[in-house]
A protein has these predicted regions:
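ATP-dependent adenylation/nucleotidyltransferase module used to activate substrates
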Residues: 2-43, 50-78, 82, 87-263
Length: 263
């Protein structure tokens, strides 16, 4: 258990110092290794959090959260910053909200950058330079990131496996179904469940909401081909097509969120 107010670890539900409720998970922070040029996720109470597990050099605090910037977004960032297309192709680029980090150096994008952007010009240049936009260095950085954070990733994997096994133990195997939407989250979930239960023959149900992009349908078919042992079914309600329902009752809105309940 962790108290955010006192920044201490405890076994109690209430902090013995301030009395506030504690959290089950210890917070993490993102450190940066300038030598390896990758972020490292560390628990705030890790005694070795300032040491890079790859090169052993001293790291520094970067942010509380971070995500990788894929080459397509990186190209857009270059254009928004009036840089040469693919100028950052050989750099380690990450982001947290509207702040970007290029080789560990912070670059903030203001709201006015997006408000004044020439979207037609951006679309034209994105199309023009996309063929030269390589994943080569990006993949190298991601491989290095995985290596630097392998202990953290192993911990998360074991935690997820334990959760799945505990939940699955309450049901007969033939009643276990994986809901598959064709997105990254359901792909990761399917992978975790199959590996945790050591059962590649589990039932996967792809819910076609009639709103799917062609690429999603294509990916669902490709997923099915790549997992021949899985029982893969498609659920589609042909009686309620999204756009037809919109004509009858109007589109989903903040005050009437009918989409999820219907599909």
């Amino acid at each position: 258990m962790w108290c955010r107010n006192c920044n201490i670890e405890t076994n109690e539900k209430n902090c013995p110092i301030c009395g506030q409720f504690t959290e089950e998970d210890t917070p993490v922070e993102i450190m940066w290794c300038g030598e390896c040029n990758v972020p490292i996720i560390r628990s705030v109470n890790d005694a070795a959090r300032e040491i890079c597990p790859i090169c052993g050099r001293k790291t520094r605090h970067l942010s509380a959260d971070l995500r990788p910037v894929f080459p397509e977004e990186r190209l857009l960032l270059e254009l928004l910053l009036d840089k040469k297309p693919n100028e950052f192709a050989g750099k380690s680029v990450w982001a947290s909200n509207s702040r970007y980090y290029i080789d560990g150096k912070s670059v903030a994008l203001s709201a006015s950058t997006f408000q004044t952007a020439d979207t037609d010009m951006l679309a034209e240049k994105l199309s023009q330079y996309s063929s030269d936009n390589s994943y080569e260095y990006f993949n190298e950085i991601i491989d290095r990131f995985v290596l630097a954070n392998k202990d953290r990733l192993f911990l998360l994997k074991e935690e997820a496996f334990a959760f799945v096994r505990h939940a699955a133990a309450q049901f007969d195997e033939e009643r276990i179904v994986i809901s598959f939407s064709g997105g990254k989250d359901s792909t990761a979930t399917a992978d975790v469940v199959v590996k945790a239960l050591s059962n590649p023959s589990l039932v996967h149900i792809f819910g076609d909401t009639t709103l799917e992009f062609p690429s999603t349908i294509e990916y669902a078919h490709r997923f099915r081909e790549n997992h021949p042992q899985a029982i893969f079914e498609i659920a589609r309600n042909d009686e309620q097509v999204f756009y037809d329902v919109c004509e009858d009752i109007g589109p989903p809105a903040r005050m009437m969120r009918w989409c999820c309940s219907m599909f």
